[in-house]
Regions:
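Beta1-alpha1 glycine-rich phosphate/pyrophosphate-binding loop at the start
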Residues: 224-284
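Flavin-dependent oxidoreductase catalytic cores
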Residues: 1-226, 230, 234-246, 254
Length: 285
């Protein structure tokens, strides 16, 4: 069970001096502002028992002059110490659109931009701590844990782009991980309450039908795919995966098409990586 008290949701609003203007036992001092959240955690523990895992998600910093800062977030974490099994440390506030791209880091931020918050919280509690924030590379995740910055690493959008990241990391196949481009395509569909979509994972939502998302073809055919851009490469990969004999032709001297100029800027390196992943899969197919 995760009890979410970050990002401007209800518990987060109680914690924040900006939103919480109450004058009773649930407002004023930090102890009072945290009372509702702590009582909820205690009620969950009473309901599920001592052996059931509970995660509390908090902000390490609202990143706002008027919100709850790191010092108070540390004190909230101390209040949770021993009451939960894991403290998940995020940041930001959905009420401020400018902070959305820090809560869910965009491509303009380095991978793991929010890890420092979990690392600071970890210094003050005995409960295991998890970090979040635009993590995609197993090597970086291992470095974070080995360096003592966090006990666990949690990923969200990265698993939408490639649900098999843990398995590929275990098999030492990190080079085949489809990188999340941090383009927010998945968020747009979530807001519209539609099936989630992903710019780099055409199989999203189809994993229940088969691991590869597409069943083998009933009849093997010889197929010509014209154009070695991202669409052409993915078409060739999918066709080959279904058992067809595929020929992929491209007029340029390299595969990738517009992914090359699209991934040229320093903050678009994920696109360049995605291009190379597709090229590798074409050669393997």
């Amino acid at each position: 069970v995760q009890v979410h008290a970050a990002h401007g949701w209800l518990f987060s609003q109680f914690l924040s001096p900006y939103y919480n203007k109450r004058t009773d036992e649930f407002g004023g001092s930090l102890e009072n502002r945290a009372r509702f959240f702590v009582k909820a955690v205690e009620a969950v523990r009473e309901a599920v028992g001592p052996a059931f895992p509970i995660e509390a998600r908090i902000s390490g910093d609202d990143l706002s002059d008027t919100g709850i800062g790191m010092d108070e977030c540390i004190e909230v974490a101390k209040m949770l110490d021993g009451k939960v099994d894991l403290i998940n440390v995020s940041c930001g506030n959905h009420e401020d659109p400018a902070l959305f791209c820090r809560t869910h880091p965009s491509a303009f931020f380095k991978r793991g931009v929010n890890v420092y918050l979990a690392a600071e919280i970890k210094k003050h509690v005995k409960t295991p701590v998890a970090c979040v924030g635009s993590l995609n590379d197993p090597a970086q995740m291992e470095e974070i844990i080995a360096g003592g910055e966090s006990d666990y690493v949690e990923i969200g959008r990265a698993l939408v782009a490639d649900p098999y990241i843990p398995e590929k990391a275990l098999r030492d196949e990190a080079e085949d991980i489809t990188p999340c481009l941090r383009c927010y395509e998945c968020f747009g569909e979530t807001v519209q309450c539609e099936n989630i979509k992903c710019a780099v994972n055409p199989k999203i939502g189809l994993q229940l039908f088969s691991r590869n998302g597409f069943a083998p073809a009933a009849e093997k055919k010889r197929v010509l795919v014209a154009g070695g851009g991202p669409a052409g490469m993915q078409a060739a990969i999918t066709l080959a995966g279904r058992g067809h004999e595929v020929t992929l032709v491209e007029k340029a001297d390299k595969l990738g098409g517009n992914l090359h100029p699209a991934g040229a800027a320093y903050f678009k390196r994920d696109i360049a990586k995605f291009c190379q992943v597709l090229i590798n899969r074409v050669h393997k197919a």
